[in-house]
Design a protein with these regions (language model features):
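Single conserved hydrophobic/aromatic residue that forms the stacking wall/gate
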Residues: 1-8, 12
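Ligand-binding cleft/hinge of the Venus flytrap
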Residues: 18-31, 116-135, 163-171
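Short helix-initiation/N-cap motifs at beta->coil->alpha
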Residues: 35-46, 58, 128-146, 158-159, ...
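Beta->alpha turn/N-cap motifs
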Residues: 39-41, 50-51, 56-64, 113-114, ...
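Flexible hinge/capping segments at coil-to-helix
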Residues: 91-106, 200-202
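Pocket-lining segment of extracytoplasmic ligand-binding domains
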Residues: 142-145, 149-234
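Secondary-structure end/capping motifs
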Residues: 199-277
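Conserved C-terminal helix/tail region of periplasmic/extracytoplasmic solute-binding proteins
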Residues: 268-297
Length: 297
């Protein structure tokens, strides 16, 4: 049995995996795949320890895993979404229609050095003073409630929280990081695999990715059906939100790439180079560190 693991908050991004399960793509490939919930410290540690063969993480958060003194033995093997769909959201009435205007307003931070460096870059590039952004350390669970309370801006993934704000009828400004600085069009999220497992089982790894690719291709072409499959697998999700979210994500799975899952070396390396230059990693990341396209066919 192959175990694939990802955090509950990313459940909607597992879409292709659920489709591959429901449509029998794994079975056709001779694979028995179980999707499991990782512990609080995340999917990457579980995959690194061999507790799961594959998992889901993000290029920005993986940087620490790859650059520590004892790097975690995981590698990114496919991009779930072709572009970084995250950005800053705020209520329109706050007037934050460009990143420099975040000055004097509050922002919900999860206190990651990379997160804050990215934010500082876009604010200052737009002429704002980052030291005058009010950083509030908090984890935002309910985006709508947060924006109505004392949080004026939040870093969100549009495919879930942005869609949720639209559904609730909120009038918002959304500033995508990829538009503010092309260096920040990194891969988020990606499928990672355990290095040792993949080395010993290259054919199984290829078969797994091939089935997952079919799943995401199906989701890209059939968002409504894919949403139903996700709701069947995770019934506690909001039905309308899942439908709208899949409508949005269906255009993001492949977007302008030649095929689903493709990771462009220039974009991958560009972001890690920026982390190196800004001393945001313990040890400099080598070119092409942390990803391979060898298993995706």
């Amino acid at each position: 049995t192959l175990l694939a693991s990802s955090a509950a908050s990313d459940v909607y991004k597992r879409q292709g995996i659920y489709v591959a399960q429901e449509k029998g793509y794994f079975k056709e490939a001779g694979l028995d795949v179980s999707v499991i919930q990782p512990p609080d410290d995340g999917a990457t540690d579980l995959v690194a320890s061999g507790g799961a063969a594959f998992g889901i993480d993000f290029q920005d958060t993986l940087a620490a895993a790859f650059s520590s003194d004892s790097p975690l033995p995981v590698t990114a093997v496919a991009a779930i979404l072709q572009h970084n769909t995250s950005g800053l959201i705020s209520l329109k009435k706050k007037g934050i229609d460009s990143p420099g205007k975040l000055e004097g307003h509050s922002y919900a931070t999860w206190d990651s050095p990379i997160e804050q460096a990215v934010l500082k870059n876009v604010v200052e590039k737009d002429g704002g003073d980052f030291s005058r952004v009010k950083l509030i350390s908090t984890y935002v669970e309910d985006i709508v409630a947060a924006l109505h309370a004392d949080i004026e801006s939040v870093w969100i993934y549009y495919g879930w929280d942005g869609v949720k704000c639209d559904m609730e009828g909120l009038s918002t400004n959304f500033l995508p990081f990829a538009d503010m600085n092309p260096t920040f069009d990194y891969y988020s999220p990606v499928i990672i695999g355990n290095n040792d497992y993949m080395k010993k089982n290259p054919d199984t790894t290829k078969a797994f990715l091939s089935a997952v690719k079919k799943g995401y291709e199906y989701a890209a072409g059939n968002p409504s059906d894919a949403a139903d499959i996700l709701l069947k697998a995770v019934p506690e999700l909001d039905e309308k939100l899942v439908q709208k979210s899949q409508e949005y994500l269906s255009k993001q799975y492949i977007a302008d790439a030649a095929q689903w899952g493709e990771i462009d070396a220039n974009r991958w390396n560009g972001f890690y180079q920026w982390l190196n230059e800004n001393k945001l990693v313990d040890n400099a990341l080598d070119e092409n560190a942390g990803f391979t396209m060898d298993y995706l066919k």
